[in-house]
Swiss-Prot record:
Organism of this sequence: Synechococcus sp. (strain WH7803)
A UniProt-annotated Pfam family: Ribosomal_S21
Lineage: Bacteria, Bacillati, Cyanobacteriota, Cyanophyceae, Synechococcales
PROSITE patterns documented for this protein: RIBOSOMAL_S21 (PS01181)
Stated family: Belongs to the bacterial ribosomal protein bS21 family.
An MF annotation (GO) of this entry: structural constituent of ribosome
Listed name of the protein: Small ribosomal subunit protein bS21
Entries under NCBIfam families matching the protein: S21p (TIGR00030)
Length: 56
């Protein structure tokens, strides 16, 4: 789970930007999008191949 603590002198805008960056980096929206619809075996294969390429 992604959490952001807001400092005393920190604005909401900067905390929101940090939160969005952490969510994007964690891949939460990609997972939600993927789980929203049925994934065919070929789509699953393509997604995993793309993940392997990203890790290199």
């Amino acid at each position: 789970m992604t959490q952001v603590t807001v400092g005393e002198n920190e604005g909401i805008e900067s905390a929101l930007r940090r939160f969005k960056r952490q969510v994007s980096k964690a891949g939460i929206f990609a997972d939600l999008k993927r789980l929203r619809h049925h994934e065919t075996p070929i789509e699953k294969y393509k997604r995993k191949a793309q993940q392997r390429r990203r890790r290199r």
